[in-house]
Swiss-Prot record:
Keyword Secreted annotated: yes
Tissues with expression: Female saliva (at protein level). Distal-lateral lobes of female salivary gland (at protein level). Not detected in male salivary gland (at protein level).
Other information: Immunogenic; elicits antibody response in individuals exposed to Anopheles mosquito bites. May serve as a marker for evaluating exposure to Anopheles gambiae bites.
Protein's cellular compartments: Secreted
Span of the signal peptide: 1-28
Protein name per the record: Salivary protein gSG6
């Protein structure tokens, strides 16, 4: 009886093991995070703030980044907007639109997202 059970297990498990060795695991696809787009989804290129030589977003973006979580990287536009009024509601491109999404805020310190 024990031999039959072992043979039955071998018949079931062997094809699975062979299939596993023939078909490689699908590698997780790495998707590059376009940080410029994440940070500055609504850029007014006539008034781009700079910090240590790097370009950053307008006040229009700062209004929306105030809603986002703080990251490990100290970004000048991640601080809370002063007072209770929004920093700015429009610029020369029109009304501000939310340009930073929570799912990217959570992972903004990563260069790639694995999908």
């Amino acid at each position: 009886m024990a031999i039959r059970v072992e043979l039955l297990l071998a018949m079931v498990l062997l094809p699975l093991l062979l299939l596993e060795s023939v078909v490689p695991h699908a590698a997780a696809e790495k998707v590059w995070v376009d940080r410029d787009n994440v940070y500055c989804g609504h850029l007014d290129c006539t008034r781009v703030a700079t910090f240590k030589g790097e370009r950053f977003c307008t006040l229009c973006d700062t209004r929306h980044f105030c809603e986002c979580k703080e990251t490990r990287e100290p970004l000048p536009y991640m601080y809370a907007c002063p007072g209770t009024e929004p920093c700015q509601s429009s610029d020369r491109l029109g009304s501000c639109s939310k340009s930073m999404h929570d799912v990217l805020c959570d992972r903004i310190d990563q260069a790639f997202l694995e999908q």
